[in-house]
From Swiss-Prot:
SUPFAM superfamilies: Actin-like ATPase domain (SSF53067)
Domain of life: Eukaryota
CDD domains the record matches: ASKHA_NBD_actin
Substrates-to-products reaction catalysed: ATP + H2O = ADP + phosphate + H(+)
Tissue and organ distribution: Expressed in several different spatial territories of the embryo.
Protein's UniProt name: Actin, cytoskeletal 1
This enzyme's EC code(s): 3.6.4.-
Length: 376
């Protein structure tokens, strides 16, 4: 399926980033922010030919004069008009394809409401005239990308995190746990603790700078208390970062205090369990006979699992919770930022998958509810 003529399209719509490309490729061709920006003031500059909305990178680069909105909140689409703009931009500007010529594989959050799947299906067939489409659960695709069909996926992106136990390719809905703690919260927390150090970041534009600091300098400590002592007694953990205006700031214990919130949500004033405990709780909701397979196949996925040190810390924390002789293995593939997309690319190019597509004809006969019968 390497010729782009009839290749299926794979679009992973995350809360923070859209990953899009062609089935059979090993990485997405287009990765851009899931944002739609509208001008704050009508016609700031005369004769600019201002558009009424900008999507993705265009919105990002003009963020000074725009109000930015994310149509996907906590992994779930909340604004369909803006979502349509994002898809339109994906097809026509990023991938430069005619959507009516390619089957399209979309991804959805675990526990996505039924009405949402139907709406997605409807838009693909009615607005974009897709010849065929399919909706797959994000975590399941990540597991496929790691070469497994059984395991538990901890998927953490920008807007939401999930633990999803999967057995023989099927997600076990009763054991899926959702954690409203993800990249955006960690960025906000870093903004807050940098403010305590005397650096203020407040606007949406400045938040993007902080996100960059987070991605470049933060890491997860194996032993938080000990790391705090090291940071207090020496400057070995300090790193400097140059802001766009040339000012250089120094950050020390913030580097690991910030992602520590994943393990201790109380840092953010949240009462929920940390990611290690959530994983453990999710496994404990599964049948006792498959727990061994889940402990031995714990797969990390999504951009917020990219912190250095997260896998070792996860191993340590889950080992402490699990039965003493249990074999625990945390799998953290280097490309996990894109593993949902990669899994989709693998799935959509399998010869056995070709009969799974929902065709335009089936949609015309059954309507949007066809998605519940064909995608699960």
């Amino acid at each position: 399926m390497c010729d782009d003529d009839i290749a299926a399209l794979v679009i992973d719509n995350g809360s923070g980033m859209v990953k899009a490309g062609f089935a059979g490729d090993d990485a997405p061709r287009a990765v851009f922010p899931s944002i739609v920006g509208r001008p704050r003031h009508q016609g700031v500059m005369v004769g600019m030919g201002q558009k009424d909305s900008y999507v993705g990178g265009q919105a990002q680069s003009k963020r000074g004069i725009l109000t930015l909105k994310y149509p996907i909140e906590h992994g779930i689409v909340t604004n369909w008009d803006d979502m349509e703009k994002i898809w339109h931009h994906t097809f026509y500007n990023e991938l430069r394809v005619a959507p009516e010529e390619h089957p399209v594989l979309l991804t959805e959050a675990p526990l996505n409401p039924k009405a949402n799947r139907e709406k997605m299906t409807q838009i693909m067939f009615e607005t974009f005239n897709s010849p065929a489409m399919y909706v797959a659960i994000q975590a399941v695709l990540s597991l496929y990308a790691s070469g497994r069909t059984t395991g538990i996926v901890f998927d953490s992106g920008d807007g939401v995190s999930y633990t999803v136990p999967i057995y023989e390719g099927y997600a076990l809905p009763h054991a899926i746990l959702r954690l409203d703690l993800a990249g955006r919260d960690i960025t906000d927390y870093l903004m807050k603790i940098l403010t305590e150090r005397g650096y203020t970041f407040t606007t949406t534009a400045e938040r993007e700078i902080v996100r960059d600091i987070k991605e470049k300098l933060c890491y997860v400590a194996l032993d938080f208390e000990q790391e705090m002592q090291t940071a207090a007694s020496s400057s070995s953990l300090e790193k400097s970062y140059e802001l766009p205006d040339g000012q250089v700031i120094t950050i020390g214990n913030e580097r690991f205090r910030c992602p520590e919130a994943l393990f201790q949500p109380s840092f953010l004033g949240m009462e929920s369990a940390g990611i290690h405990e959530t994983c453990y709780n999710s496994i404990m909701k599964c049948d006792v006979d498959i727990r061994k397979d889940l402990y031995a196949n714990t797969v990390l996925s999504g951009g917020s699992t990219m912190f250095p040190g997260i896998a070792d810390r996860m191993q340590k924390e889950i080992t402490a919770l699990a039965p003493p002789t249990m074999k625990i293995k945390i799998i953290a593939p280097p490309e996990r930022k894109y593993s949902v997309w990669i899994g989709g690319s693998i799935l959509a190019s399998l010869s056995t998958f070709q009969q799974m597509w929902i065709s335009k004809q089936e949609y015309d006969e059954s309507g949007p509810s066809i998605v519940h019968r064909k995608c699960f």
